[in-house]
Amino acid sequence: IEKKVLDMSLAGIFTAIIIAMSVVPFLGYIPLGFMNATIIHVPVIIGAIILGPKYGAYLGLVFGVTSLVKATITPGVTSFVFSPFVTIGGYSGNMWSAVIAIVPRVCIGIVAYYVYKLIMKVAHGIKGSQTVALWVAGIAGGMTNTLLVMNGIYIFFGQSYAAASNKAVEHIYDVILGIILGFGIPEAIVAGILTTAITKV
C-alpha cells in the first residue's frame, strides 16, 4: 500500500511538471516558426522508468492532452494537425488531429520503459549498464514521439500541412525528414542526457 501511495504521489508530481512545462512559455515548448521543439517528453520518460509502463502511458496521455489544448488555445499556422477544433487559413483539424496529439505521446513512456528494461536485462552485471540503459531509453522515447507525430502528420495531413507551411506537396516528406533530423534527433539526444542525469540522482 505504501508503494502504491508513493507511486501515485510521484505520478501527481510528474503530472504537475508536465502541465507547468506546457503552460510556461519557452519551458516545455520552444516556438520555431511553423513548429515547436519540445522537451516535455522528458518527464514522461523518467516517470515511466521509475513508475512503470502504465504510469508512463498515463503521463504520455497528460502530455498529449496538454498538446491538444495548447494547439486549440494558442494556435500556430499548423496547429490544426494537433487539434480537431482549429481551422487555420482554410485548413481544419479532425479526429486524426487528436490521434496525432495523443497516441504517440502515450507510446513514449511505454517504449522508454521496455527499452530500459531490455538493456538492463541484456547487460545485467556490466559496469555502467544503467547509464547506457537510461541514455538509450531517453533517446528511444524522444524518437518515438518525433517519428510517430511527424509520420502521422504526413499520412493524415500531408497536403494541407504542405500548403500551410508553404511547401510543395511533392517535397513535403523531405520537409518531414528535415524536421526529424534537425529537431527530432537533437530533442532525443537531449532527452537521453536529461533522463540519465535526473534519474540517476
Q: Which functions belong to the PLM regions below?
A:
Residues 1-201:
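Loop-helix junctions at membrane interfaces
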